[in-house]
Amino acid sequence: MSFRFQRSDERKHHGGLEHGSCMAKDLDWMRERFEELSKSGLNWDPPVLESANAPRVVINGKETIMLSANNYLNLSTHPKVVEASIEATRRYGAGSGSVRAIAGTMDLHLEAERVAADFKGVEAALIYSAGYTANVGLIPTLVNGKEDVIISDELNHGSIIDGVRLTKAQRAVYPHNDVGALEAVLKENQDAKRKLIITDGVFSMDGDIAPLDEIVDVAEEYDAMVFVDDCHGEGVLGDGRGIVAHFGLQGRVDFEVGSYSKAMGVQGGIVAGTEQMRLHALNHSRSWLLSGSQPPGVAAAQKAAVEVIIDEPEHVRRLWDNTDYFRRELESLGFDTGVSTTPIIPVMCGESTTAKRLSLAMRDSGVMVGAIVFPMVARDKARVRTQMSAGLSREDLDEVLHAFEKAGKSIGLI
């Protein structure tokens, strides 16, 4: 069978692109689906920032205290990070011009990976375009088929879930942070050819930490691989080096995924581990092989952000000072902060309507905090999620606490 492509003048003659007849005739399902989302209040309508994503931002012309960003260490505007990006862009250009595998790897990328590996205390690292692409690209390469099993925490991030769905391995989910249940699954599957345990390091909805030390002990007993997504732990735990350093597990975790777009304030994902892991991912991970290379300015900023964390430990200390103070004061006002032990501090509300009312009241007071409702969390576990920043002053925090007290009383939450 042969095909002949129409010339543009032929398409116009037949009313093609000009009149939209080449498009699918019925796209009403999109509108109907969006209307259903809107009716249930689950549609996304992102606020638009008119400034840098800093402790105080401008939204709709109004100065607002930012408590919803991942910019934990406030490095997105750090002079050393910004200048590194500008200098590299001037020298190397705005883009890398190719995928990494063909002609898009620059010395800047390798330098950023070397600095990250040294920082993590591992042999090697490989940078991806995002933490999401690291998970969906690497996980499918670690198992072959039905003879293998993936065992995943029930509250793992959606990018992990998507990565697991791309595999043909057997799948098991264990109750959140329940190492006993994890071991029971390992026992049931001890004859599997490959066993892969996957967990978040810091869980993004509740702000609690995986018992990675216990997970690694069990994994070694059953000869299982350990994969940890530490996107919310890097720059936060273990003097900034993440959950592996926090528990002193260097050399015992097979795959450590991280993100440059959170505490490091830049963009991109990273996988850290052995040199063999890097070579494996570089040759088999489709999301790495088929994604455009990070722009030179981004690679330089990635390297600079890690160097700032190493050279200026006061950022991590200030983050934890703010976190401890803010959580303690919230609880003294009568708010429930759940099981959080990190800079992700939820204010538990129960019903979705309560969380939305609290979020709106805080917005009216000049504070940006997001309502997290079903299906992102259970129906009775709605909350307003706050995320702490090292850049917030004590005066900023007191202003936020006053707004929470006022809003909480007005809606009957405290």
Describe each region flagged by the PLM.
Residues 19, 79, 83, 87, ...:
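PLP-dependent enzyme catalytic core of the Aspartate aminotransferase-like
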Residues 317-326, 331-366, 376, 380-381, ...:
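Conserved PLP-binding catalytic core of the aspartate aminotransferase-like
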Residues 99-103, 113-137:
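Short loop-beta-helix segment that forms the pyridoxal 5′-phosphate
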Residues 26-92, 224:
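N-terminal "arm"/small-domain region of PLP-dependent enzymes with the aminotransferase-like
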